[in-house]
Amino acid sequence: MQQASNTPKSSLIELNAPDASPYPFNIVVREELGDNIKMFSFTVTGIDFQTKQVKTCEYQLDERNHKGYLNFFEKLALDFGLRLPQNRQMVQTNPEFKATYREVLSENLDPQILYGYGDPAVIQVKSDSTTEEPIFYLLSTSNDAPHAFPIIRSRNLQDWEFVGFVFPENHKPAWAANDVLVSDYWAPEMHQIKDKFYVYFVGRDKETRELCIGVAKSFNPEGPFLADEEPIISGNVIDPHVFVEDNGTAYLFWKEDNNDVWPGKLINFLYENPAYILDLFEEEENKITASFMVTLWPWVQNLEPMERFLFNQVFIESIIAKYLLFFDRLTEIRKDKPTPIQEAIQEVQQFMKTPMYIQELSEDGSSLVGERTKIIENDLAWEAHLVEGMWVTQHQNKFYLFYAGNDFSTDQYGIGVAIADSLLGPYRKMPQPFLQSTAEWWAPGHPSVVLAPDGKPHLFLHGYFPGKAGYKQFRALLSVPIIFEEDRVLLGEI
């Protein structure tokens, strides 16, 4: 990487493909500061995949959001033959999957809610009075919005009103990052444990930029909430879920966010060993994509985590389209290789699994006690590179684990089910996704289960409008009735 010039408002960075890269690129990145945010433009020189002649193209990243990156990579696909982003491909929903999602909320209830109702967690809070109906509360993801974690309430699960935020502006946890394009406030869940309300949530450590799980507490489900001074778990962990037993003992579920780790490990390995691109990728478009990302990597690796994901996404998609086969190919390639190569590939494979764990919470809800137990990990083809967004509910003598799999920002995302005889498992997965994208709603994800006023169980989830999936895009609140059977879950009738 060569820095050609550097001024307070503008810098040029020149990047060349490493030797032995099968599709050599030269990329010049221009960073310009405008309106307190950097804007990027690129001069890309490479081989035209149709004429096989060298050409140079100019690109301006028109927006530093998911749409802007999709536009950028769509143009690269047309000019240089990179893989077309999944969200720009012709979508074919599974014709065998039939479901009707009930639209609960399809717009923000308050202007301060910026991104809708991603990762919706619903609970019922019973009144101390025998004459008053219980109230349902729902919390959702807020990403980098000024106010974190909207709280809404309802008495019937149909009509909702805005209450406020777990963390209003300037009241976020001291340990967590709080900047646009940097902070990530995800997946809050509120649970009542005895006489107190606990909100478990994801935030990004302001020093390490790692995702962590924190907790905030209040005696009122509508707040105010006070966060603990330190997170409960650190080190790229997300999606806390709490299960409270009848005796008040609480357990915390969480997921290791290794899907944020392995892409960088793999790209770095290919940067140092570019000849393996030809061994690992079959389709030419994927070889070109890998070569492009390897060239860009010395610059991309220094970006903030979610922006790094937006750059890496098409590379990730080239792998998760046949994820289990790619994993097996890595295993085959590392055989009989020098020890450093074997160790580097094994490290990539280690992070290609995203295990979920459960562990008992302390009585004050601020720490873990005992030993953790692994619940599930991604091992089905449809799940691809991750499982996440879990919720466990008990019905009779069975425990039902609902979870999401695949890429949250594409039509490939879906919801799975695993069933156990004990809270700690072992859990047996239903082989096919329980919920998938439809023509009306994309990427159903991060479910929660609640009993409706009529006593019947309903699954609440989020979904994108078709063609509008992506990071920090609006997610609607949807629901479906469900029926529990001993070895499976079925959709009920709306």
What residues fall within each predicted segment?
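Carbohydrate-active catalytic/glycan-binding domains of CAZyme proteins
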Residues: 2, 6, 10-14, 18-37, ...
